[in-house]
Swiss-Prot record:
Similarity field: Belongs to the PsaF family.
Keywords annotated in UniProt: Cyanelle, Membrane, Photosynthesis, Photosystem I, Plastid, Signal, Thylakoid, Transmembrane, Transmembrane helix
Keyword Repeat assigned: no
Source organism of this protein record: Cyanophora paradoxa
Protein name in UniProt: Photosystem I reaction center subunit III
Amino acid sequence: MRKLFLLMFCLSGLILTTDIRPVRADVAGLIPCSQSDAFERRLKNTTQRLENRLKKYEPGSAPAEALQKQIDKTQQRFDKYRNSGLLCGADGLPHLITDGRWSHAGEFTIPGLLFLYIAGFIGWSGRSYLQAVAASDNSTEKEIIIDIPVALQSVSKGFVWPLAALQEFSSGKLTARDEEITISPR
């Protein structure tokens, strides 16, 4: 009981003395794009170049409308950068922060994890298809000419690939036994 009380006392002292104010650390001299003069200059120069090209065409013509759409898309893109909280460098370009901070997770961490999930999904579905086809009579032919029902079944199994991989790894089915691995006689 004394140890529990002492632990609670130490934890409460630690919590009370910890400063938990939000801190905004300077990230390699980057500033928010909404406050960057170089970012605004880049927007102005980009749209001005497009507007100069637009003056060469008659209003309402196909090239003029295409350039106007490009100007609108450029302004929308810069507005997204400005409003998303991205940080810009001295060149006025947005920079992605990849240091693992949760405040910048949307820039690199979440897309990276999504990429790994999709790559694993494709690999697991392909592996499942090849294993299912290997048990059939015409396995070589089915590797070239895809059997759609088997492929759809394999793809449906692929959505839960992280759980299936963990299950197969823990059961030992995912990895080869030591006896199955050949050793070079060198």
